[in-house]
């Protein structure tokens, strides 16, 4: 069974490309993203809605709750989950479904820095072999990186404060998770100890993309539904703009760290693996 690995930093089009290959070869996409294993963090992690699969099959390594302990799960747990998924795909694999001899039985899409490092540094020890790697990478020109950051800014803006009324948001997503921690005792008092634990789980999982700033925003008792009745509109616009800028910078810096790591890992790929670099210009 041939496996195609599509890698790249945030916002470069990995999901669109993996869906295209999935439909072309009738092959499932296995998502190598640790945070997308938490459905409660679907907006924060960029986990697409099922309506965006466009007929392709998308498999996550596992489904986990945002709760104490799950932030410390070792990388080997996810790798073992991946191997189990591949065993199942292999058992169901029918070569006659492939359009040609170069068809892939599975598409990997990644993803998380920790999982990519674990996968690519131990690539020869895996029971299944990756036959081709496509690396989608923003070109290094200053102008292109300005456009890349602007694209992330646009994505973050919609993630935090969607313009379409009724759409879910990262603000509401994080608020739902934090509310799980606000358990009430018999005296009607909030158990702040568990609340703080949930908060620390969030920070541990997605602290690199500015989640503490979102939490701080909510700690000020921000309420998306009635904020206009509490705060001056100009002040509201100011604090929203500040949050968008902060989260954009966090996502952009994380993307740069992804690029740096992948650049390093690519140099270590075995020569037997077909490799394609897609330098993209952001538009």
Curated annotation (Swiss-Prot):
Catalytic activity: dimethylallyl diphosphate + AMP = N(6)-(dimethylallyl)adenosine 5'-phosphate + diphosphate
EC top class, as a word: transferase
Signal peptide positions on this chain: none
InterPro entries: P-loop_NTPase, Tzs
GO biological process, one term: cytokinin biosynthetic process
Transferase listed as a keyword: yes
Keyword Transferase: yes
Disulphide-bridged cysteine pairs: none
Gene Ontology molecular-function annotations: AMP dimethylallyltransferase activity
Enzyme Commission number(s) from the entry: 2.5.1.27
Keywords: Cytokinin biosynthesis, Sporulation, Transferase
Domain of life: Eukaryota
Family designation: Belongs to the isopentenyl transferase family.
Purpose: Transfers dimethylallyl groups to AMP as part of the biosynthesis of cytokinin phytohormones like isopentenyl adenine or discadenine which controle spore formation and viability.
Protein known as: Adenylate dimethylallyltransferase
Organism: Dictyostelium discoideum
Gene: iptA
């Amino acid at each position: 069974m041939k496996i195609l690995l599509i890698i790249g930093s945030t916002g470069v089009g990995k999901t669109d490309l993996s869906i295209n290959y999935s439909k072309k070869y009738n092959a499932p996409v296995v998502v190598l993203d640790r945070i997308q294993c938490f459905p409660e963090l679907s907006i924060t992690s960029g986990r697409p809605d099922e309506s965006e699969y466009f007929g392709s099959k998308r498999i996550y390594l596992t489904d986990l709750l945002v709760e104490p302990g799950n932030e410390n799960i070792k990388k080997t747990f996810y790798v073992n989950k991946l191997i189990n998924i591949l065993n199942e795909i292999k058992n169901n694999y029918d070569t006659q479904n492939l359009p040609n001899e170069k068809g892939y039985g599975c598409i990997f899409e990644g993803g998380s820095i920790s999982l990519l490092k674990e996968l690519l540094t131990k690539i020869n020890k895996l029971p299944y072999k990756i036959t081709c790697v496509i690396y989608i990478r923003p070109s290094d020109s200053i102008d292109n990186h300005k456009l890349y950051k602007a694209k992330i800014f646009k994505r973050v803006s919609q993630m935090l404060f969607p313009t379409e009324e009724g759409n879910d948001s990262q603000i509401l997503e994080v608020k739902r998770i934090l509310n799980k921690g606000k358990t009430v005792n018999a005296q009607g008092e909030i158990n702040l100890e568990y609340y703080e634990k949930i908060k620390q789980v969030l920070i541990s999982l997605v602290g690199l993309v500015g989640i503490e700033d979102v939490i701080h925003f909510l700690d000020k008792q921000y309420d998306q539904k009635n904020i206009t009745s509490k705060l001056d509109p100009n002040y509201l616009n100011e604090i929203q703009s500040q949050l968008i800028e902060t989260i954009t910078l966090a996502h952009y810096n994380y993307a740069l760290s992804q690029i740096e790591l992948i650049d390093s890992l690519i140099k270590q790929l075995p020569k037997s693996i077909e490799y394609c670099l897609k330098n993209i210009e952001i538009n």
